[in-house]
Regions:
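Extracellular beta-strand ligand-recognition surfaces/modules
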Residues: 292, 334-370, 375-376
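A structural motif
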Residues: 66-68, 98-100, 112-116, 150-154, ...
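Beta-strand/beta-sandwich contexts
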Residues: 23-74, 120-164, 196, 207-233
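C-terminal motif of bacterial Sec signal peptides marking the signal peptidase cleavage site
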Residues: 17-21
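Short, aromatic- and glycine-rich surface loops/edge beta-strands on solvent-exposed regions
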Residues: 108-119, 196-206, 357-359
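Extracellular ligand-binding interfaces
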Residues: 270, 276-277, 283-342, 369
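Short carbohydrate-recognition loop motifs
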Residues: 241-271
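Extracellular polysaccharide-targeting segments
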Residues: 143, 212-224, 364-382
Length: 382
C-alpha cells in the first residue's frame, strides 16, 4: 500500500511540473508584419544606392544596385528603366523598399524614368542613367601575324554589340572574323591581306570608331633588332635557333634569360639613333607614344626596365603586381612625355644629328628573368 502511495505521489508531481512548464510557453504577436503585402498603389519617395541608403540620388550607372524607398512596393509585375525591362528574378522587394540592379543594356529610347508596376498600380519617377561610351585602346599586339588571334582592347564591347553577326572589325578595308567578345576586348583573327600601317576600324549597331595605333606600326621605328648597330647586347639576340625560343613577332628579337643580383645593372641595348621627324617628337612629346613589343616566359617581379633618352625613366610593370604575358607578345605603350620626364629635345646631347639611347634592366631583388623585346619605336598619337 505504501508503494502504491509513493507511485501516485510521483505521478502527481509530474503532472504539476508539466502544467507549470506549459504556463511558461511564450505567446508570439500574431500581428507581426513581414512587409510582404501591399494594400494600395505603389509610391516612391526617394531613390538611393543599395550601399548608401541615406543619400538621395537622381542619377545612376549601368549595373549599379539601387534602392527605391516608398510604400506598397511588393507584388511587382514589371519594372522599366527607360525602355529596358528589369529581370524580376534580380530584385528584392518589401512594402517600403525595393532593391534592384540597373540593367547593363543600352536603351533605345531614354525618357530618364523608372516605372514600377505592381498588382495594385503603377508609379513612375525620374532617374537619369549614365551610359558609358565604347572605348578603344588599341591592339594588344600590333605585330600579330596574319591568321593569329589578337585582341582589340577597350571597354563596353558587349554593351555596344561588337559581336559576331552584329559588329564588324576592319584592318584597313579588310574585315576580320570576330572570335570572342567580352566587356574589355573583342578578339579577332588577323585577316589575309592585312597591311602594315592599317587602321583598326570598329563598327556596331550603335558605334563607329577607330582604335588608336596601327597594325604593325613602323612609324618612328628606331630599333627593330634586325638592323642593330649598337655597342652591346648582340649576344642576347636570337633568330629562334634555340629549341626553347618563343615564336618571333617580326624577325630577330632580343631575349634576356638570366639571373640578376640585387640592384645589378645590365645594359642590353645601347646606341646612337637619328633624330627623326625633325625633332618634333622631342619638342612636343605629348603628341607621341613610346612603344615596343614584350614577351615573358617568367613573371617579372621587382626589376625595372630603363628606357633612357638621357632621362632615367624606368618602366616597372611588376612594381605592384607581377607582370606576365604568359608567353605571348604584347604591345606596351608609354606616353613619350612620361619617358622624357618633361625634358625637351634641346636638352638631349647630340652627336652628328643623332640622339643617344639605351635600355637596361636594374634594381629590385635578386631575380631570374626570361623576357624578350622587339620593335622599339616612337609613334604619333592617332
Amino acid at each position: 500500500m505504501k508503494i502504491i502511495n509513493i507511485t501516485y505521489s510521483i505521478i502527481f508531481a509530474g503532472l504539476v511540473f508539466l502544467a507549470t512548464a506549459c504556463s511558461d510557453v511564450v505567446t508570439y504577436n500574431d500581428g507581426y508584419d513581414d512587409q510582404l503585402a501591399s494594400y494600395g498603389p505603389p509610391s516612391v519617395s526617394r531613390i538611393t544606392t543599395a550601399k548608401d541608403t541615406a543619400t538621395i540620388i537622381t542619377e545612376s550607372s549601368l549595373a549599379e544596385m539601387i534602392t527605391l524607398h516608398g510604400n506598397n512596393l511588393t507584388d511587382v509585375t514589371s519594372i522599366f528603366i527607360n525602355d529596358v525591362e528589369v529581370d524580376l528574378s534580380t530584385i528584392y522587394a518589401v512594402r517600403t523598399r525595393l532593391t534592384l540592379p540597373v540593367p547593363r543594356i543600352l536603351p533605345m529610347e531614354a525618357d530618364n524614368k523608372i516605372k514600377v508596376t505592381t498588382k495594385l498600380g503603377t508609379v513612375s519617377v525620374p532617374l537619369t542613367v549614365n551610359v558609358p561610351p565604347l572605348a578603344l585602346s588599341g591592339l594588344d599586339n600590333e605585330y600579330a601575324a596574319v591568321g593569329d588571334t589578337v585582341n582589340v582592347n577597350g571597354a563596353n564591347f558587349d554593351l555596344y554589340e561588337i559581336v559576331d553577326g552584329k559588329g564588324k572589325v576592319y584592318f584597313g578595308d579588310i574585315e576580320a572574323k570576330i572570335d570572342t567578345t567580352t566587356a574589355e576586348y573583342v578578339a579577332v583573327i588577323v585577316p589575309q591581306g592585312a597591311t602594315q600601317g592599317d587602321r583598326i576600324h570598329v563598327v556596331g549597331p550603335l558605334a563607329d570608331m577607330y582604335a588608336p595605333g596601327r597594325y604593325m606600326d613602323n612609324r618612328g621605328l628606331f630599333q627593330d633588332i634586325d638592323h642593330y648597330q649598337g655597342w652591346t647586347g648582340q649576344n642576347w639576340f636570337t633568330d629562334v635557333s634555340r629549341p626553347d625560343d618563343p615564336k618571333p613577332c617580326s624577325g630577330l628579337y632580343t631575349r634576356i634569360n638570366r639571373t640578376l643580383g640585387p640592384w645589378e645593372w645590365f645594359d642590353f641595348i645601347a646606341s646612337w639613333y637619328p633624330v627623326f621627324d625633325g625633332t618634333d617628337c622631342f619638342d612636343n612629346p605629348e603628341k607621341y607614344d613610346y612603344k615596343f613589343e614584350v614577351l615573358t616566359l617568367i613573371p617579372l617581379k621587382t626589376k625595372g626596365i630603363g628606357l633612357i633618352f638621357q632621362t632615367g625613366y624606368y618602366w616597372e610593370p611588376g612594381k605592384i603586381v607581377e607582370f606576365n604575358t604568359n608567353g605571348k607578345w604584347k604591345t606596351i605603350t608609354v606616353p613619350l612625355e612620361v619617358v622624357m620626364n618633361g625634358m625637351k629635345e634641346t636638352n638631349l646631347p647630340h652627336e652628328n644629328g643623332h640622339v643617344g639611347f639605351q635600355i637596361n634592366i636594374a634594381g629590385g631583388e635578386s631575380e631570374t628573368i626570361d623576357i624578350s623585346f622587339d620593335n622599339f619605336r616612337i609613334t604619333p598619337k592617332d
